[in-house]
């Protein structure tokens, strides 16, 4: 009986670990070896766990306006870096660089840097990174 209990616990732990790994596999959603830059006006800021999102209206080269979803860190992680739910406001004009989504039609980006030109606020995902 103990043997079955141990086998069951090991199997459950393996499944939970696999699920956590899959959840944090950004490579499944984003092209991490590529970088794009988007510029637009903030229409929504979801400051939450496990991931925050910034939504922007971006004017494409052909003049159409497209809404982009930009994935950011979780609220707890961002607070430790000085970001709060008050950091960004609807209407803020921002420039974001990051990894593009695998499906271009999804208009997704995983944020690396953010710059708000009106006051020079900047955020870099990598330690010590400053946005020009």
Which positions does each model-derived feature cover?
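OB-fold/S1-family single-stranded nucleic acid-binding modules
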Residues: 101-128
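Positively charged n-region of N-terminal signal peptides that target proteins for export
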Residues: 1-4
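Bacterial N-terminal signal peptides
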Residues: 7-15
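Short, structured beta-strand/loop micro-motifs enriched in basic residues and often containing a Trp
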Residues: 72-80
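Short nucleic-acid-contacting surface segments enriched for D/E, G, S/T with interspersed K/R
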Residues: 80-96
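Short aromatic-glycine-enriched beta-strand elements
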Residues: 48-59
